[in-house]
Amino acid sequence: MIKVGIIGSTGYTGLELIRLLHNHPNAKIIALCSRINASKSVIKEFPSLISYIDLDFVTPNEKKLFECDIIFFATPHGVAMNSVSKFLNKDIKIIDLGADFRIKDSTEWSKWYGMTHTQGDLLKDAVYGLPEVYNSQIKNATLIANPGCYPTAIILALKPLLETNIIDTKSIIADCKSGVSGAGRSANIATLFCEVNESLKPYNVDQHRHKPETQQVLTDIAGKEVNFFFTPHLVPMTRGMLASIYVDLIKDINVQKLFEKHYQNNKFIHILPTNVYPQTKSVKGTNNCHIGIQKSNNKLIIMSVIDNIIKGASGQAIQNMNLMFGLDEGLGLEQIGLLP
């Protein structure tokens, strides 16, 4: 049984880790950390966990953490980088759901996140945890940088095209929409009900922090520099993400067949039939990514949807854990979507 600890267990991604890991046949949560709620009963703070979790929250310095086989950091950027070394030195595996190890260049990271990276030497060892791209590296990793939600949706939609070199890599447009849970659980005026209800707005246009990690991986896949324009939007729903990506084809091939063949053996990526378009409701509560394709002359639109908290965060983290421990990557993650 894999002994699991979660640091930052009261945010949306931390709570989703608890929910998913409870049903994992090979994992057992032994430590849930929260500075604010230390010593408080988990079920008193989160009644949805009554009869499922019989633990009290502990501080991140709790000795129990050193009994873990793996620790998930479901924390804001800047937290994991100052804490992981003491666990790695004890041969405890780490998955960081934050952004601390996603960008390989510490100077570039500091530019986007506004602070100095204190563990630049670990960046070279961290593996970007997108199993559909770095599967073999994840299996041998001890430190995983779990991808952001936007990068996950964008990269999965573009991977087959970049690997076959059939699109212009300088004119890609990513038009993305996210549910409000992507902003986290902390109080914020911008995500209050009255601010987001019946409203749709772009934000951080081409300046979102997820852009550099996306560009880094797309360039790695293509083997040459990839540039893209990125407009994220906030939509008035709790969870879900849609990425509509516009590209110019430089070769005329059957793109539908290309995608179907590319992902035919993949557990979580599903290519929809021609003229069937993805919707966020179809993947809600799952680790799936649905992809639809529409071609018009030399233009191609790829549409991908994910649950931003599961495939975009906690589910993907568990998928990575499975690979790190030599398990089937889908273990504990094959839920059917919620409908309605």
From Swiss-Prot:
Catalytic center residues: 149
CDD domains: AGPR_1_C (cd23934), AGPR_1_N (cd17895)
Catalysed reactions, semicolon-separated: N-acetyl-L-glutamate 5-semialdehyde + phosphate + NADP(+) = N-acetyl-L-glutamyl 5-phosphate + NADPH + H(+)
Pfam family, one: Semialdhyde_dh
Source superkingdom: Bacteria
Main location as per UniProt: cytoplasm
GO biological process: L-arginine biosynthetic process
Pathway annotation from the record: Amino-acid biosynthesis; L-arginine biosynthesis; N(2)-acetyl-L-ornithine from L-glutamate: step 3/4
UniProt cross-references to InterPro entries, sorted A to Z: AGPR_AS, AGPR_type-1, NAD(P)-bd_dom_sf, NAGSA_dehydrogenase, Semialdehyde_DH_NAD-bd
PROSITE patterns to which the protein is assigned, alphabetical: ARGC (PS01224)
An MF annotation (GO) of this entry: NAD binding
UniProt entry keywords in alphabetical sequence: Amino-acid biosynthesis, Arginine biosynthesis, Cytoplasm, NADP, Oxidoreductase
EC numbers on record: 1.2.1.38
Cellular localisation: Cytoplasm
Gene3D superfamilies on file: Dihydrodipicolinate Reductase, domain 2 (3.30.360.10), NAD(P)-binding Rossmann-like Domain (3.40.50.720)
GO cellular component: cytoplasm
Entry's family note: Belongs to the NAGSA dehydrogenase family. Type 1 subfamily.
Protein name: N-acetyl-gamma-glutamyl-phosphate reductase
Organism: Vesicomyosocius okutanii subsp. Calyptogena okutanii (strain HA)
Species classification: Bacteria, Pseudomonadati, Pseudomonadota, Gammaproteobacteria, Candidatus Pseudothioglobaceae
